[in-house]
Amino acid sequence: MAALLSNSARVALRSGASATSKAGAAGLTFARGKATLPDLSYDYGALEPSISGKIMEVHHKNHHNTYVTSYNNTLEQLQEAQAKGDIATQIALKPAVNFHGGGHLNHTLFWENLAPKSAGGGEPPSGALSKAIDSTYGSLGEFQSKMNAALAGIQGSGWAWLVKDKQTGQIGIRTYANQDPVVGQFQPLLGIDAWEHAYYLQYQNRKAEYFSAIWDVINWKTVEKRFT
Amino acid sequence: MTSQTHTLPPLPYAYDALEPVISKQIMELHHQKHHQTYINNLNAALSAQASATASNDVPTLISLQQKLRFNGGGHINHSLFWKNLTPPGTPANDIAGAPALREAIVSRWGSHEAFVKAFGAELLGLQGSGWGWLVSKGGAKGRLEIVTTKDQDPVNAPDVPVFGVDMWEHAYYLQYLNNKAGYVEGIWKIIHWAEAEKRYTAGVENPLKL
């Protein structure tokens, strides 16, 4: 019922205003207080051959949508607990907020930091970000191999991110388990999904091939915007 | 200091024997690639550990612990998993062949059905990669508990892993995609209850020597 409502409300919203969050995911949309699945700015098949259309479709329509639905369900329970002043339930719901809310945030950021080659995917960064990468890692290639090593080293499900340290302004690579989002001291710049569902239909156990192919569809323009 | 090299244990059935619950392709990749990789990385970690031990290099020994835990756990968990599965329709899949375990399950959860429901809910509640286990606490014929372990964390002694279900996406994704509930529902058709009974009543001395 709630899903139906927010779905139709989302259609109405699309032509109008869309909310922007402080986390930097420009595509985070809400309808009547509910999170909604953001549209992709490209077709499911547009990231081929790096990521197959089938993967993109299941990943967006099923996985991401489940995080959205579960987050909204969690939020409803949270609001109920808040209204009742039920502190124990509010605390017990924290892992669910982190997991489902994190899943929604992470995927929204991920879609936006990808782009088809025809729309600039894979074109190297320029300006201040390019300088920061060179001065931190030596070169873009060096950064990419460090990021790939971080991705390969994740034990279980998770993400690797290029982040900016809000205290020092420095950039760095950090990995996060499961759907833990990049919050607090660090600001997410570029995220790569290392869950098996992100690549398994195409690459199976050969995840290193996925990590190396994804650089062809990285949207550095988005990463630059997040950096500055 | 000798370091034994671990090798991939053969499956006790053919790759396609668990169909239609788990496809041949999944079983081949899961056994030949995923399990093999844990073994390769475990052997590498053990060999690095042997050198570090020989040179009394404590910082290296400490830094190797997580690799041992992850890859050793992966080897142990998969070895237990293959053996607690059986082709559908075989006598081993009949819970009647596990009288002591069934009695303990019924006394703990009220009924076999209630246990199946509770176990499924626990599996589906896992956030990320991991395993679901029926565990006998403290040793054989102990109190039964449903336990999940994250990533490749194993069930540690003295607790006994009666049976385990792999909830990593690679265990089901090629066949079930995001429908992990379908996988969890199907798994009961291939649980090896006779093996579970043996583990519950006699314990598991060494999961790598079943």
From Swiss-Prot, chain B:
Localisation: Mitochondrion matrix
Post-translational modification: The N-terminus is blocked.
Gene3D superfamilies linked to this entry: Fe,Mn superoxide dismutase (SOD) domain, Iron/manganese superoxide dismutase, C-terminal domain
EC number: 1.15.1.1
Listed cofactors: Mn(2+)
Keywords annotated in UniProt: Antioxidant, Manganese, Metal-binding, Mitochondrion, Oxidoreductase, Transit peptide
An example Gene Ontology CC term for this record: mitochondrial matrix
A molecular function (GO) term: manganese ion binding
PROSITE patterns per UniProt: SOD_MN
Residues holding Mn(2+): H30, H78, D166, H170
Catalytic activity: 2 superoxide + 2 H(+) = H2O2 + O2
Details of cofactor binding: Binds 1 Mn(2+) ion per subunit.
Major place of residence: mitochondrion
Coiled coil spans: none
EC primary class: oxidoreductase
Subunit field text: Homotetramer.
Family membership: Belongs to the iron/manganese superoxide dismutase family.
Annotated function: Destroys superoxide anion radicals which are normally produced within the cells and which are toxic to biological systems.
PANTHER family assigned: SUPEROXIDE DISMUTASE, SUPEROXIDE DISMUTASE 2
Full protein name: Superoxide dismutase [Mn], mitochondrial
Source organism per UniProt: Penicillium chrysogenum
Gene name per UniProt: SOD
